[in-house]
């Protein structure tokens, strides 16, 4: 019943929860039914949860994004690195296909995953590629830092914390977590410290590689509930990592020397091939990387074997750095122009200034990562003074502002002339 008379007063009741109009804030009438604000809010929560669930599983059950579509989205945010984008796009596409294959009927052919290793100099876009993937993917995605990892039992994070983050990302839904993608940054920092086995335990190097082996290949990880610490007589969440795709990235400083030592061994005698050590840049050298070079660098052979796809990123030249400054959707120049527009001021960075920024980043060997610090230093004083200045219409940054630290040019708005009375 939705209506009831009490002491001459006609009381209305919610048709769903039965509460009276006095027990709720609002009662909305329909054809012979009523619904209260509390039931409406509950319905909205149910619909939101269902929509969120369908979005999370769209990559598995819906239309698969093709490698071309994935690559086109990466192009909007990351300049260059065409080969690395292709490798990532194909790997992610195949990951979606594997999940769909597993969710369907069982087949005699078992599809195994192809984990990826990204090799490239600092500031070449490894982390940005991973962050951009995180925005466009419909499967859980987490990033981890290899430098914080140690063997279990030592101070620091153990490798199972990575899976714990994956669980947290999808609100401890184990099925979703088992279909996720993990990006481990700075993987080169856990290389073995020496070619020869040491009598002291290498808890943050080879020890971490050994711990990651089974996790990357596929194992049942025991995760404490709600991020607690492990202790006896505790129920653990069991997560199978067999279908979790792992992408590892690192700068691998010094790997180029290992590759050159292998490829440029000089022969002796008349039949020896003469090779020049000059004219090869870092990009060309990294393209010649072989598993044996990674082992020589300090990764254990078993770990290298579990990363079958190796993608190398190019060293960014001056033109590429300028493109990064102005072309992507979230380009650095666009970000600063937005900040200045909030003060009602236009910001113009002249082409010569852009070239100066790029040259400075190359000189510092910081790649694209160093662009922000250079621009921030050049614009710091004007950003400090601008809120106190009246009538500034435009700020112009030229080459001298970047190279010599001179102040940018300020253009003031013309003041309207007031005609004097005779």
Curated annotation (Swiss-Prot):
Belongs to the ClpX chaperone family. GO terms for molecular function: ATP binding; ATP hydrolysis activity; ATP-dependent protein folding chaperone; protein dimerization activity; unfolded protein binding; zinc ion binding. Transmembrane segments: none annotated. It comes from Azoarcus sp. (strain BH72). ATP-dependent specificity component of the Clp protease. It directs the protease to specific substrates. Can perform chaperone functions in the absence of ClpP. This is ATP-dependent Clp protease ATP-binding subunit ClpX. Keywords: ATP-binding, Chaperone, Metal-binding, Nucleotide-binding, Zinc. NCBIfam families: clpX, PRK05342.1. It comes from the Bacteria. GO terms for biological process: cell division; proteolysis involved in protein catabolic process. Pfam families: AAA_2 (PF07724), ClpB_D2-small (PF10431), zf-C4_ClpX (PF06689).
């Amino acid at each position: 019943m939705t209506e009831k008379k009490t002491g001459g007063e006609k009381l209305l009741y919610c048709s769903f929860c039965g509460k009276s109009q006095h027990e709720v804030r609002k009662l909305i009438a329909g054809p012979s039914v009523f619904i209260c604000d509390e039931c409406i809010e509950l319905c909205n929560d149910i619909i939101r949860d269902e929509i969120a669930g369908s979005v999370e599983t769209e990559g598995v059950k819906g239309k698969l994004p093709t490698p071309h579509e994935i690559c086109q989205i990466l192009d909007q945010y990351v300049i260059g690195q065409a080969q690395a984008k292709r490798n990532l796009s194909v790997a992610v596409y195949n990951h979606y296909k594997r999940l769909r294959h597993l969710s369907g009927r069982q087949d005699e052919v078992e599809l195994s995953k192809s984990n990826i290793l990204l090799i490239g100099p600092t500031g070449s876009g490894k982390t940005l590629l991973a962050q951009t993937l995180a925005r466009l993917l419909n499967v859980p995605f987490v990033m981890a830092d290899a430098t914080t990892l140690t063997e279990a039992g030592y101070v620091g994070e153990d490798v199972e914390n990575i899976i714990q983050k994956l669980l947290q990302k999808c609100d401890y839904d184990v099925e979703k977590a088992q279909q996720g993608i993990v990006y481990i940054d700075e993987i080169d920092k856990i290389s073995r410290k020496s070619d020869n086995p040491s009598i002291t335990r290498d808890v943050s190097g080879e020890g971490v590689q050994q711990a990651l082996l089974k996790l990357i290949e596929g194992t049942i990880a025991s995760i404490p509930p709600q991020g607690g610490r492990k202790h006896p007589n505790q129920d653990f969440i069991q997560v199978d990592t067999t279908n979790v795709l792992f992408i590892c990235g690192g700068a691998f400083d010094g790997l180029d020397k290992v590759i050159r030592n292998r490829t440029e061994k000089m022969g002796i005698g008349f039949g020896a091939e003469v090779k020049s050590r000059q004219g090869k840049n870092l990009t060309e050298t990294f393209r010649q990387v072989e598993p044996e070079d990674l082992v020589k660098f300090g990764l254990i052979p078993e770990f290298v074997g579990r990363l079958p796809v190796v993608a190398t990123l190019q060293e960014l030249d001056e033109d590429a750095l300028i493109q990064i400054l102005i072309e992507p959707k979230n380009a650095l120049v666009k970000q600063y122009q937005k900040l200045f527009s909030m003060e009602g001021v236009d910001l113009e960075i002249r082409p010569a200034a852009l070239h100066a920024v790029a040259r400075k980043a190359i000189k510092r060997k910081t790649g694209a990562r160093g662009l922000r610090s250079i621009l921030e230093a050049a614009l710091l004083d004007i950003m400090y003074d601008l809120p106190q200045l009246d009538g500034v219409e435009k700020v112009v940054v030229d080459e001298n502002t970047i190279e010599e630290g001179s102040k940018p040019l300020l253009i003031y708005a013309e003041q309207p002339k007031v005609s004097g009375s005779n």
